A protein has these predicted regions:
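Amphipathic/hydrophobic helical signal segments and adjacent flexible N-terminal regions
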Residues: 1-73, 81-85, 192-227
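Juxtamembrane/interfacial segments around transmembrane helices
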Residues: 59-68, 87-95, 152-156, 186-187
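Solvent-exposed loop and beta-edge segments used for protein-protein assembly and interaction
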Residues: 68-72, 94, 103-105, 131-133, ...
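Tryptophan-anchored aromatic micro-motifs
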Residues: 70-93, 113, 173-179
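A generic structural signal for short beta-strands and their flanking turns/coil linkers
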Residues: 72-74, 96-98, 107, 133-137, ...
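Short Pro/Gly-enriched beta-strand edge/turn motifs at strand-loop
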Residues: 82-84, 108, 143-147
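N-terminal glycine/threonine-rich, aromatic-flanked beta-hairpin/loop signature
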Residues: 90-130
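Cytosol-/stroma-facing membrane-proximal "stalk/adaptor" domains immediately downstream
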Residues: 120-227
Length: 227
């Protein structure tokens, strides 16, 4: 998200650019004529801020010293271990494989989980950096099962998840989730590709292609397809 450091930097850039424009035009820096170039300068800096918020924040040159926020963009393969008991068998369900799509800017984060039977989307989120230098993301979400399952085996519900962001890149996310239906479980996200998929079937097909195909998908980049 935009912090005081970012806002101060953009304000400072505006002032410097403004004074530079006055100097180039030969205007006295304390003259009332400073108003003339101000609109141009504000528009220019506003454009820079928009580009920075959408793309440039994730560039390596800004990592660590100016932007302290992990780049989670892309599609992750998710494994869910639920404690839900299937009433038809009396047993705990097998691990559920799905795909998590993250679209991100400096100021926003959108998370979608897609499985063969339902879709979840984030309602609110927070990313924090703990004292151990590990980032953690918390998400509140709404889950909508496929229409043919509603009223039979599953209903629309809400839940929360809490994940640790691990490795350089990062490489994976691990944590747990719980729902307002009284169920809970573990979750692991790994094997990220940079492309964002809009449905479970597309993601499933891509992740089940040969490894070389996955590399080709990754090389397409997140800049255009997964903001």
């Amino acid at each position: 998200m935009l912090t005081r450091t970012h806002i101060s930097a953009f304000v400072g850039l505006t002032i410097v650019a403004w004074l530079l424009a006055l100097w180039i035009q030969g205007q006295p820096l304390l003259s009332l004529s400073f108003i003339r170039p101000f609109g141009i300068v504000v528009g220019l800096v506003g454009g820079v801020a928009a580009v920075f918020n959408k793309w440039a924040w994730a560039w390596p040159i800004f990592r660590g010293w100016f932007v302290d926020r992990p780049d989670l963009r892309g599609t992750w393969k998710a494994t869910l271990l639920s404690d839900w008991i299937d009433p038809s068998t009396g047993n705990r369900v097998d691990p559920i494989v799905g795909y998590v799509v993250v679209r991100q800017t400096l100021a926003s984060l959108s998370v979608r989980l897609m499985t063969a039977e339902s879709r979840s989307h984030s309602i609110s989120h927070g990313i924090t950096k703990e004292s151990d230098e590990i980032f953690r993301v918390a998400v509140v979400y709404r889950n909508e099962p496929e229409i043919e399952l509603q009223g039979k085996r599953s209903e629309i519900h809400h839940g929360s998840l809490w994940l640790e962001i691990l490795g350089e890149g990062p490489k994976c996310m691990k944590g747990h989730y719980w729902t307002d239906r009284g169920t809970r479980g573990g979750m692991q996200l790994c094997d990220r590709v940079r492309r964002c998929f809009d449905c479970y079937e597309y993601a499933h097909d891509a992740f089940n292609c040969p490894e070389t195909s996955l590399e080709n998908e990754s090389q397409k980049g997140a800049e255009g397809t997964c903001p």
